Every structure is written in C-alpha cells, then in structure tokens.
Amino acid sequence: MDYLLKTEPSTYSFADLEREKATIWDGVSNPVALKNLARMKTGERLVIYHTGDEKRAVGTATVVSVDASDERNPQVKIKAGRPLTKPVTLADAKASDVFSESPLVRQGRLSVVPLNERQYRFLTGE
C-alpha cells in the first residue's frame, strides 16, 4: 500500500525533508491516521502533500523503518524522494474519478491517507 502524508508547509515542508534527507514522521493525533501510520511497512511509497493555502501533492518519499510497538505513537522514519514535476492540487484530485471514494476527498482532516496504485500514479505522474 502507498500513502499520502499531509503537512503544513510553514511547520514542516517537503523542502525541509529534502534538506534533512530523512525524518521521523510525528505530530499525528487522529486515531485513524495513527492506525494508518502503524500499518506502514518498510519500502512503501509515500506522497507528501502540503495543506493550508497550497493544498497540493508536492513530492515523494519512502518508508525507511516502522516501530509500531506503541500504537498510540508509531515511529515511522521516512526518507525524501523527489519533488513532483507537476504538483497535483486537491481540486485536480476531486475532479478525477480516481479519488471518488478516497479519504483524501471524503475526510479532509485525515493526515495519513492510504492510496491505491492508480491514485499514487495519478499524483506522481509515474
């Protein structure tokens, strides 16, 4: 499974991740988002999405390691991938049938969103 990780760029942006190369993804409090974090597996692909005024997918990353021994605070280390050649906006996703049943458009406050292969390809252009 692939995932989309939402972040407020003024707090932590994709550029920050690129500069640091890797980070522990934290600051998640929603119970569903925490469960999604805990389900992640090493090597899974991620899309980084900027919230706030941007509302767009901006880059890729990969899960490096997962420690879900504490389900209330899973520790997921991710490493930066590449910036997207063409960032995809929330409006683009909503206009596509690819996301009609996705939490990305149905649960706007969910910060860790599972993606199927088709959704991942739509966002990344791969």
Label every model-predicted segment.
Residues 47-48, 62:
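Hydrophobic beta-strand signal
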Residues 49-55:
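Short, charged beta-turn/beta-strand-edge "cap" motif at the junction between a beta-strand
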Residues 56-67:
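Short beta-strand-centered aromatic/proline hotspots
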